[in-house]
Regions:
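Residue-level signature of mid-helix packing/kink "hotspots" within the transmembrane helices
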Residues: 51-59, 142-143, 251-259, 345-346
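Symmetry-related core transmembrane helices of the 12-TM Major Facilitator Superfamily/SLC fold
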Residues: 160-177, 365-381
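C-terminal ends and interior cores of transmembrane alpha-helices
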Residues: 79-92, 281-294
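Cytoplasmic helix-loop-helix junction between adjacent transmembrane helices
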Residues: 102-140
Length: 398
C-alpha cells in the first residue's frame, strides 16, 4: 500500500499503542476478580468507569485537536496514559487500581480521535484507505498484545504492568519525534462538541437512533467476552494463555480475512443492512456455542464465529451513518455512533457482572441472545420511515 510516510508513522504508533493496552484490557476482569478478590459486579463497575473516562477523553481529544492540533493532543493523551501505567507498575492494589484505570481511559480516549483525524488529513486522497490502515493496525495490536499478555500473565501479572509501560514509552518516543512535523490542517476539522444537534425532527437522525439501538445491544453482548466470559473460562480451568489466544485469533482473522470478506459482501451480502443482519445472526450463534462450551475448542469456535460477525457489523454502522448524515453533520453523526459503542462498553460489563453474580452464566447467555434478536428487529426497521429510499452500498474493501 503506497501510503505517505506520515501515515505509516501513525499506523505504527497506533499498533504499538493498542499492543500495550491489549496486554491489560482482556485480563482486567480476571485480575480484579481473581487477584484483587472483588466480585464480577465490582469488576463491571470498574470497567464502566474506565469506559466513561474514555468518553470524556474522546470529547476532550476532539476539542483539543481543533484548538492545538493533532501532535500536542496525542502527546498529552500519551503522557496522561504513560504516567498512569508507570504508576501501575509500582501500585496495583485496591483501590489505586481503579483510579489508574480511569486515568488510562482518559488518556487513551484523547489519543484515538486525534489519531483518526490526523490520518484523514495526511492522506486526503486516500479516502477510506487511511482509516482502514489505522483499523488494521489496531487489530494487529490486539492480536499481538492479547497473545503476549496471556503468556506474560501466566508467569506474573506484575510483568504485564511493566510491559504495558514499556510499550507506551516507545509510543511516546514515536509520537514526540515522528508526529511533530505532521500538518494537522486543523482548520478543516470539526469536533463533536462544536456540532449543534439541530436534528430533532430529522427522519434520518431518527433512523440513525433506531439503528444505534441495535448497535448498542451488539456491543453489550460483545464486551461480555473480555469481562464475564473471561472469568467464566477461568472457572472452567481454561489457562490464561489459552483465553488470551482467543483474542489473537480475533485480531489475526480480522486482518487476514479481509480479501474473503470483500468477496462475500460483493457477491452475497450486497447491502449494508444484509451485512448487519447476517452479522447479528452470527453473534447469536457465537453466544449459543459459548453457552455450551466447556473446553477451549468450544470457545475458540465461538470466537471465530463472533469475529466474522464483528467484521460485518462494525464497519457497516459508521458507513450507514455517513450515508444518512446531512451535509455538514458527518461529525455529529459519527460522534453519535462512537458514543453508542462506548455506551455498550460501559453498560455491558456491569450488566453482565450483576447477572453472573446474582444468577448464573446460563441466564446471561439467554439475555444477551434475546437482546441481539431485538437488535435484528431494529436493524430491519431503522430506515422504514425515511421519505425516500436510501441506496446503501457495500462496505469498502479493507
Amino acid at each position: 500500500m503506497n501510503m505517505p510516510r506520515s501515515l505509516w508513522l501513525l499506523v505504527i504508533g497506533m499498533m504499538i499503542n493498542v499492543t500495550g493496552s491489549s496486554f491489560l484490557w482482556p485480563l482486567n476482569t480476571i485480575y480484579i476478580h481473581e487477584h484483587l478478590d472483588k466480585s464480577l459486579t465490582v469488576a463491571g463497575i470498574v470497567l464502566m468507569l474506565n469506559a466513561a473516562a474514555s468518553v470524556i477523553g474522546n470529547l476532550v481529544g476532539g476539542v483539543l485537536f481543533d484548538k492545538i492540533g493533532g501532535f500536542k493532543s496525542i502527546l498529552l493523551g500519551i503522557v496522561i496514559t504513560l504516567v498512569a501505567v508507570i504508576t501501575l507498575v509500582f501500585f496495583h492494589g485496591w483501590p489505586v487500581y481503579i483510579y489508574l484505570l480511569i486515568l488510562i481511559g482518559l488518556g487513551s480516549g484523547i489519543v484515538f480521535p486525534a489519531t483518526y483525524a490526523l490520518a484523514g488529513t495526511v492522506w486526503p486522497e486516500g479516502g477510506r484507505k487511511a482509516f482502514n490502515a489505522i483499523y488494521v493496525a489496531q487489530n494487529v495490536g490486539v492480536a499481538a498484545g492479547a497473545s503476549l499478555g496471556g503468556l506474560v500473565a501466566s508467569i506474573s501479572f506484575h510483568y504485564i504492568f511493566i510491559a504495558n509501560a514499556g510499550l507506551y514509552a516507545v509510543f511516546f518516543l514515536i509520537a514526540y519525534f515522528g508526529y511533530r512535523n505532521i500538518d494537522a490542517k486543523r482548520a478543516s476539522q470539526t469536533s463533536i462538541l462544536d456540532q449543534k444537534p439541530a436534528v430533532k425532527n430529522s427522519q434520518k437522525f431518527t433512523a440513525l437512533v433506531i439503528l444505534c439501538i441495535g448497535y448498542l445491544l451488539c456491543w453489550v453482548g460483545y464486551v461480555q467476552w473480555p469481562s464475564t466470559i473471561s472469568s467464566h473460562t477461568q472457572s472452567l480451568n481454561i489457562p490464561l494463555n489459552q483465553y488470551s489466544l482467543l483474542w489473537t485469533v480475533n485480531g489475526a482473522l480480522i486482518v487476514c480475512a479481509q480479501p474473503i470478506l470483500s468477496q462475500f459482501v460483493k457477491y452475497v451480502a450486497k447491502t449494508l443492512k444484509q451485512q448487519m443482519i447476517i452479522g447479528f445472526f452470527l453473534f447469536i450463534v457465537s453466544f449459543v456455542v459459548a453457552s455450551y462450551a466447556e473446553q477451549f475448542t468450544g470457545f475458540l469456535l465461538a470466537m471465530v464465529i463472533l469475529t466474522i460477525g464483528e467484521m460485518l457489523v462494525w464497519p457497516a454502522v459508521p458507513t450507514i451513518a455517513d450515508d444518512l448524515a446531512p451535509k455538514g453533520r458527518q461529525g455529529f453523526y459519527q460522534g453519535f455512533v462512537n458514543s453508542t459503542a462506548t455506551g455498550g462498553r460501559m453498560i455491558g460489563p456491569l450488566l453482565g457482572g450483576m447477572i453472573a453474580d446474582y444468577y448464573n452464566m446460563n441466564l446471561l447467555f439467554i439475555i444477551i441472545i434475546s437482546l441481539l434478536i431485538f437488535g435484528i428487529f431494529t436493524t430491519l426497521i431503522y430506515d422504514k420511515r425515511l421519505k425516500a429510499t436510501i441506496e446503501l452500498g457495500t462496505v469498502p474493501n479493507q
